[in-house]
A protein has these predicted regions:
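Glycine/proline-rich, positively charged
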Residues: 27, 94-101
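Conserved radical SAM core fold
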Residues: 52-55, 92-96
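N-terminal binding-site loop/beta-alpha segment at the start of enzyme catalytic domains
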Residues: 1-86
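A short, structured active-site edge motif that brings together acidic residues
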Residues: 83-95
Length: 101
């Protein structure tokens, strides 16, 4: 695996990121865990997720979002992997229908 410097931090991230957009929507948790395990075995330490990943195809706040982030979080917690992975995320979806989050 090739790595790149992350800014001036001294940290090195894999040039390939493992995307998690389908985790929870198309890819069930056991398969997602296997994909992340395989990614780490291949040297990938840069994972990409977002608060809308793993949610319904059409934005509907009542159906929930962030399922991908939850799956990645459970995978990290299982075996103390947090120190092994750089996690990129972004936010988009409002946190409530009232706007008072």
């Amino acid at each position: 695996m090739q790595y790149a410097h992350l800014g001036r931090s001294g940290a090195q991230v894999s040039r390939l990121a493992l995307g998690t957009m389908n985790f929870g929507m198309v890819t069930e948790e056991p398969e997602a865990f296997a994909i992340m395990d395989a990614g780490r075995e291949a040297g990938i330490n840069f994972f990409d997720t977002a608060d809308v990943y793993g949610g319904p195809m059409k934005p509907d706040i009542e159906k929930g979002f962030g399922i991908s982030e939850e799956i990645v979080g459970r995978w990290m917690a299982r075996g103390g992997r947090r120190d092994e992975v750089f996690l990129a995320t972004k936010l988009y979806q409002p946190t409530s229908t009232s706007g008072n989050a």
